A protein has these predicted regions:
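Histidine-centered divalent-metal-coordination microenvironment in nucleic-acid enzymes
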Residues: 84, 102, 108-131, 135, ...
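Helical (often loop-to-helix) elements that flank the catalytic cores of nucleotide-handling enzymes
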Residues: 97-100, 124-149, 170-192, 217, ...
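Catalytic "initiation/cleavage/transfer" segments centered on a nucleophilic residue
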Residues: 2-10, 26, 30, 147-210
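Long, charged low-complexity interaction segments
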Residues: 1-3, 80, 98-112, 184-246
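Hydrophobic, Leu/Ile/Phe/Ala-enriched alpha-helical segments that form helix-helix packing faces
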Residues: 42-49, 101, 105, 139-147, ...
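DNA replication initiation on ssDNA origins
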Residues: 1-80, 200, 204, 219, ...
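Catalytic micro-motifs at enzyme active sites that drive phosphoryl/nucleotidyl and oxygen chemistry
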Residues: 69-74, 98-114, 148-153
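Short, surface-exposed ligand-recognition loops at beta-strand->loop->(often short) alpha-helix junctions
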Residues: 85-93
Length: 246
């Protein structure tokens, strides 16, 4: 199952856990007291205190695991999940949206945010990290049309965090369908054909050779002029016979 990295105070990587495990934690009482305190502060109109309390919750990166820091160069493994956030909903909007989200076969997980007035939605895709932005935009458009509610566009970042929460009645479908992303095919890198290299002629050496060859020919011609070749009758004669005739 897809894994995520859990962070403390936004920056400190604690451990990697699967989305299944995290969903079980959210459905359990693990963060119940913290989340109920946050919602109580909001009900009292203490928004600042509620925000400070929420930021103390652990958070996880739904779309990938990271090494040490939550930066793209530190990305270790893409999870294959996109995360949507529908925030600041009325109770009626919450109820209606949750029911619709649960009927969509692409929905893997949906739970209430710690504030109690938002919904977190997790959708599995058939593409990788390279097409994360494209996948997000297509899923965002699909769910916004279904719900007639706008989602938070900041969740498009692959490094985006999601706070832990408490929602015993969350929706989870381990047999979800993958959302098929209409992504452009990756371009094939053309193979480079090696160009034959023509050896460079050393013109200086060539000229020296021609000069030397010309001198050699000239000397040979001069020698032949002073020493004409033997006549046909002398060719092949014994050297002793020749000397005897002198």
């Amino acid at each position: 199952m897809a894994s995520t990295t859990i962070f403390k105070n936004f920056a400190v990587a604690v451990e990697n856990k699967s989305l299944i495990v995290i969903s079980n934690w959210i459905a359990s009482d693990k963060y119940k007291s913290e989340v109920e305190e946050i919602q109580s502060l909001i009900a009292q109109g203490k928004g600042k205190e509620a925000t400070e309390k929420k930021q103390q919750l652990p958070a996880f990166t739904p779309s990938a695991t990271f090494k040490e820091k939550r930066l793209l160069p530190n990305l270790k493994q893409y999870s294959g999940f996109v995360h949507l956030d529908f925030d600041k909903l009325t109770p009626e909007q919450m109820d209606t949206a949750f029911k619709i989200i649960a009927t969509i076969p692409y929905t893997f997980l949906c739970f209430r945010s710690p504030s109690g007035n938002g919904l977190k939605v997790f959708v599995e895709v058939n593409t990788g990290a390279l097409h994360h932005d494209i996948a997000y935009k297509q899923i965002q458009l699909f769910y916004e049309e279904k719900l007639a509610i706008a989602s938070d566009p900041k969740c498009k970042d692959i490094t985006r965090l999601c706070f832990m929460s408490y929602h015993p009645e969350l929706y989870k479908n381990i047999r979800n369908e993958k959302f098929i992303v209409d992504a452009p095919a990756e371009l094939e890198v053309p193979q480079q054909v090696a160009t034959p290299v023509t050896p460079k002629v050393d013109t200086t050496t060539q000229k020296d050779f021609e000069t030397a060859f010309g001198v050699s020919q000239s000397q040979t011609q001069k020698q032949n002029a002073f020493n004409p070749p033997l006549s046909g009758e002398l060719e092949g004669a014994n050297i002793t016979e020749l000397l005897g005739r002198v």
